[in-house]
């Protein structure tokens, strides 16, 4: 692997792409440390230290921003608005016929959907930025903080608007940086930035576990977390690469004087066909009642119930609800992202068939049957991986700081494999051996 990486750097155009990607990553990481106007940065740092790694409802967004959310920087929202906008557009494509037609128009339709995604990203950034500023002003962003009311000293409307504009502009810059990587660098730009954002939180989280540990100065807990993380990475790589291959044969066709077809191929159905989307959906849905309860006044019974049962990661109700939501969204997302009838129609149109299965409706029913069977273990795997921080480290009392959570590991492994395969394909075009043998 190291030899292949060295060969990639020795290839002029690949080296240029890799260096360009690294330069964009440096710019992105610098932006995550530039505070927005109107924030008392010293008080923010004090609140972050007092939070002791427990970031409450904002932990997921803080992870996707590379720790910039709790620092209240110009990149505080990170790529979360873009991720949310992409998911919403993907869901609306199934519901709205106009968007579905655009999706089938090829490159022109994809460009139009990308434009809609950008517009929705800006709108979501304004909403999320306004919510973040309001939360920072009232201080529940950090939980209990001794200087909470002094995070935003000037609470005028002008200051609030300025902060929201800065964070929205920061989101637009992040989106632009991601597109630059996609066009001129290596890999998918937004995926690379997501990878860097998550990886950037690992060192501080690992060191916090070491500092909070009690066995051998915290080194036993530290080593245990590293070991669990490596095992999880190996498990996720194994499952993410696993797939059920449905054999497909194409009949020979005579067009003019030439014969076409007669080849054999397969349809790869991954065990984890839904990817990390169900985990993000479940996390977002669980945050809604907790977020409403956090800003609701009074001490009503439902607010107390939500705070006791849906905000604590080690509570049985939270664990069961989270697990069931992940399983449900896994089936839901697979159902809207993979259309067996469309695949069967395309196969029939081009003379393809599955051996032993008639073309048309029987093929669609067979694909649905196989997909449902492999989605069950895939959804259970997602649920168990997502609950590892709670189940594995609750004994150490450090589950809030556990960096190798389900969402982070799934994204890092997925993006890593995708990027390595892209570099490998470019190396193979130049007759070099790749990373994966």
Swiss-Prot record:
Protein name: Protein translocase subunit SecY
UniProt family annotation: Belongs to the SecY/SEC61-alpha family.
Recorded GO CC terms: plasma membrane
Entries under InterPro entries matching the protein: SecY (IPR026593), SecY/SEC61-alpha (IPR002208), SecY_CS (IPR030659), SecY_dom_sf (IPR023201)
Record key words, sorted: Cell membrane, Membrane, Protein transport, Translocation, Transmembrane, Transmembrane helix, Transport
Membrane topology recorded in Swiss-Prot or TrEMBL: Multi-pass membrane protein
Keyword Transmembrane helix carried by entry: yes
Location of the protein in the cell: Cell membrane
């Amino acid at each position: 692997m190291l030899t292949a990486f060295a060969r990639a750097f020795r290839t002029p155009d690949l080296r240029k792409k890799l260096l360009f990607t690294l330069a964009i990553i440096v710019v992105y990481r610098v932006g995550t440390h530039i505070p927005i106007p109107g924030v008392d940065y010293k008080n923010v740092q004090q609140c972050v230290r007092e939070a002791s790694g427990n970031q409450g409802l904002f932990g997921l967004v803080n992870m996707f921003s590379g720790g910039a959310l709790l620092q209240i920087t110009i990149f505080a929202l990170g790529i979360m608005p873009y991720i949310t906008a992409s998911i919403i557009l993907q869901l609306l494509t199934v519901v709205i016929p106009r968007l579905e037609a655009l999706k089938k128009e090829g490159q022109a339709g994809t460009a139009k959907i990308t434009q809609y995604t950008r517009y929705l990203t800006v709108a979501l950034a304004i909403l999320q930025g306004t919510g973040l500023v309001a939360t920072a002003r009232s201080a529940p962003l950090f939980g209990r903080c001794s200087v909470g009311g002094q995070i935003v000293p000037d609470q005028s409307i002008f200051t609030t608007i300025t902060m929201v504009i800065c964070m929205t502009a920061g989101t637009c810059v992040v989106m632009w940086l991601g597109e630059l990587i996609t066009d001129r660098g290596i890999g998918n730009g937004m995926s690379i930035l997501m990878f860097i954002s998550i990886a950037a939180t690992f060192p501080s989280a690992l060191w916090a576990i070491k500092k909070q540990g009690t066995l051998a100065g915290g080194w036993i807990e530290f080593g245990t977390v590293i070991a669990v993380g490596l095992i999880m990475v190996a498990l996720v790589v194994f499952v993410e690469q696993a797939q059920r291959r449905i054999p497909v044969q194409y009949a020979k066709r005579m067009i003019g004087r030439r014969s076409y077809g007669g080849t054999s191929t397969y349809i790869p159905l991954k065990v984890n066909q839904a990817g990390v989307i169900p985990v993000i959906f479940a996390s977002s849905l669980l945050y809604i009642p907790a977020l409403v309860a956090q800003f609701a006044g009074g001490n009503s019974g439902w607010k107390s119930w939500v705070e006791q049962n849906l905000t604590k990661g080690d509570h049985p109700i939270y664990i069961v609800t989270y697990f069931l939501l992940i399983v449900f969204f896994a089936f839901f997302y697979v159902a809207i992202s993979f259309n067996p009838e469309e695949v069967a129609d395309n196969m029939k149109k081009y003379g393809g068939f599955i051996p032993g299965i008639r073309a048309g409706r029987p093929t669609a029913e067979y694909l649905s049957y196989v997909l449902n069977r492999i989605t069950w273990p895939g959804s259970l795997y997602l649920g168990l991986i997502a609950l590892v921080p709670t189940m594995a480290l609750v004994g150490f009392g450090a589950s809030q700081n556990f960096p190798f959570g389900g969402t982070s590991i799934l994204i890092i492994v997925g993006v890593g494999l995708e990027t390595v395969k892209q570099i490998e394909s470019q190396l193979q075009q130049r007759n070099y051996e790749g990373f994966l043998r």
